[in-house]
């Protein structure tokens, strides 16, 4: 058996990635989220495939085909809600995974980090297009509002929007192409995930201390396979609690009304995992400025390795940086709350303050505090 595992062309790739992989001996539960993201992706592809068997990408039948899946298909309701809430779990794990990377300085593995940012953008695009497919009110108006942002691009904006729509408004052509992209993108995500792992295994994983673990490695199996299974079990418990007890908790009631181009919902808002970026977008009165702030709010992750001024890699022994990190987390939670509120006083002012704080923390305060900590440690 050992010979097959280590010598077979396919098996030895699996062996070197998941079985005999040398892993740091001290990585904590914050390192579980990579495998949980893999599990979420697998779940999304499987449930998505079964949904695609019954879904019709046509404006006249899309809404009723989703209702048909929930009412008439065997276990269709659970497949649909696993897929919808699976996206929420995916983003929850994704945000924690990125947060862990920021806290423990994993961004110094630049290739892995940059592919991770590309993955984040791809997953966000996939989730946005998936939200359009049920063709409810929020699907239609969400698609209209978000695609319309591209019209802020000078000179080519309007043409670009109409090109994406496939006409002069969000209609049948838009729905069909969104379904096509929503179907193909997860497989592109799988390819990017393999690249992400490839670059990670070139350098080896980081650890909570931020030091080299070359002198103290343990095999991935059985230690971390068992540890990942525990994380997976907890995720399944959380997921099934959500799906079986309150599947619509994170959804929008407006999406149970069929899309109507003549009736605008009072508050157009995306799913909860986009609200922080949506709040940043809305906090700038200028359209182009808002779009740039929206893009930069995520693209800012790419310059974090440049902004890293600390002599220590991890924040584990840097209490001042820890304070700023948790302030950033709180700020993102405030932005998420603001993104779901109507555009009126005092929410506009809170959103603007939180947006300014977000960029100030990352671009100015964190690098400054890192330099102060270097001085305090006489480094």
UniProtKB/Swiss-Prot annotation:
The protein's GO terms of the molecular function aspect are: metal ion binding; ubiquinol-cytochrome-c reductase activity
Question: Which residues hold heme b b566?
Answer: 97, 196
Gene Ontology, cellular component aspect = mitochondrial inner membrane; respiratory chain complex III
- Family matches, as Pfam families: Cytochrom_B_C (PF00032), Cytochrome_B (PF00033)
Gene Ontology annotations of biological process type: mitochondrial electron transport, ubiquinol to cytochrome c
Positions contributing to heme b b562 binding: 83, 182
The organism's superkingdom is given as Eukaryota
Report keywords, A-Z.
Electron transport, Heme, Iron, Membrane, Metal-binding, Mitochondrion, Mitochondrion inner membrane, Respiratory chain, Transmembrane, Transmembrane helix, Transport, Ubiquinone
Note the topology in the membrane: Multi-pass membrane protein
Q: Which parts pass through the membrane?
A: 33-53, 77-98, 113-133, 178-198, 226-246, 288-308, 320-340, 347-367
Query: What Gene3D superfamilies would the database entry show?
Result: Cytochrome Bc1 Complex, Chain C
Give its localization: Mitochondrion inner membrane
Annotated residues that bind a ubiquinone are located at 201
- Name its co-factor(s): heme b
Q: Which cysteines are joined by disulfide bonds?
A: none
CC cofactor note: Binds 2 heme b groups non-covalently.
Q: Which CDD domains would you find in this protein's record?
A: cytochrome_b_C (cd00290), Cytochrome_b_N (cd00284)
Task: Cite the record's note on assembly.
Answer: The cytochrome bc1 complex contains 11 subunits: 3 respiratory subunits (MT-CYB, CYC1 and UQCRFS1), 2 core proteins (UQCRC1 and UQCRC2) and 6 low-molecular weight proteins (UQCRH/QCR6, UQCRB/QCR7, UQCRQ/QCR8, UQCR10/QCR9, UQCR11/QCR10 and a cleavage product of UQCRFS1). This cytochrome bc1 complex then forms a dimer.
State the function annotated in the UniProt record: Component of the ubiquinol-cytochrome c reductase complex (complex III or cytochrome b-c1 complex) that is part of the mitochondrial respiratory chain. The b-c1 complex mediates electron transfer from ubiquinol to cytochrome c. Contributes to the generation of a proton gradient across the mitochondrial membrane that is then used for ATP synthesis.
Miscellaneous: Heme 1 (or BL or b562) is low-potential and absorbs at about 562 nm, and heme 2 (or BH or b566) is high-potential and absorbs at about 566 nm.
Family membership, please give it.
Belongs to the cytochrome b family.
Q: What is this protein called?
A: Cytochrome b
The gene is: MT-CYB
